[in-house]
């Protein structure tokens, strides 16, 4: 699955409804967030398991009718480097153990 790293998204991961349904993720609760345009959004939150840095992690998954997004909660403890140019590299690297949550 491809996803976009969204530095303005403070959640863990967002997935579109069809993908959540096909994965059979269990519903957990409703959530509320303020979007970049200032509007409020109410959405469903599910529970998912991801393999991140070779470890399984149980995380909340927000339902959003968009491209899958990786949020800053999942990126906590990692360094993000972006080459801002055509075909630039995006690198995600774990910080030293003492600097991880």
Can you say where each PLM-predicted feature lies in the sequence?
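Pepsin/retropepsin-fold aspartyl endopeptidases
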Residues: 1-101
């Amino acid at each position: 699955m491809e996803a976009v790293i969204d530095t303005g998204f403070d959640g863990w991961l967002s997935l579109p409804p069809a993908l959540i349904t096909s994965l059979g993720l269990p519903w957990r609760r409703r959530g509320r967030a303020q979007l970049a345009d200032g509007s409020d959004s109410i959405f469903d939150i599910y529970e998912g398991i991801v393999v991140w840095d070779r470890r399984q992690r149980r995380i909340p998954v927000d339902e959003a009718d968009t491209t899958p997004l990786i949020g800053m909660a999942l990126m906590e403890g990692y360094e993000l480097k972006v080459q801002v140019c055509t075909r630039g590299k995006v690198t995600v690297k774990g910080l030293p153990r003492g600097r991880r949550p």
